[in-house]
């Protein structure tokens, strides 16, 4: 957009500097694992505690590389679900999700707020000691559902509005 033409893109270190004490930043990696050595330098130079930084990616190889090269920070695999039109089956199944999380040594799952996420899904993940984060939750009823399920966090486009609707302060 023209009104932002002269704006400078902040560096990752500059973004890290905006994270308040006790809060977390989710760093989504959109490319492949070739970025991890540079990310490692940025993370190691950050004035944040390791527990404040969480890497997320749809690319399982990125998560595996982060867990190997930067084991001090959490890395969550991102996934969404597709339905087979012929069988009606959804994939990945919870079994496939857990197998992938184990294979790549992920710290947890960050997934879309799908109807598949139910008590059994959460129990299966918790049984394996994985975190669960959901996106994009912009409606109070959906937020209440995922809060009741006990997810670790939700991602929303309307944080202030949603907190007010849920009477969270």
Describe each model-derived feature in a short phrase.
Residues 1-83, 104-116, 126-128:
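Metal-dependent phosphodiesterase/phospholipase catalytic core, i.e.
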Residues 2-9, 85-169:
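C-terminal active-site rim and adjoining tail of enzyme catalytic domains
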